[in-house]
Amino acid sequence: EKGDGNMKLIFAIVSNDDSSRVSKELTKNRFSVTRLATTGGFLMAGNTTFLIGTDDDKVDEVISIIGKHSKKRTQMVPSSASYGVGMYTSFPVEVQVGGATIFVTNIERFEKL
């Protein structure tokens, strides 16, 4: 099976907390997805990166599904500060987590063997 030049590859990085819902909804809407386990750099939290190949005219639908099922939320994470030589204290900091980071690229060639 070969694709024409009007296909896109969507990379969607989603929190593990949302990945099952996103995957289920994409599959229900007949999108083929590949899931990769990834780790974010800032919080070192587990993520799922979805690879989704689709026709150009379906990109907005994919992004809408991902957005609907990957919600932003706040979370308290430990942080530390120095208040003297060799003296540190730890305190919680509220950060925003979740949501999705999405990249859309052109596909030069697609073959399913």
PLM feature spans:
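Positively charged, small/polar-rich N-terminal and surface patches that mediate targeting and assembly
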Residues: 2-113
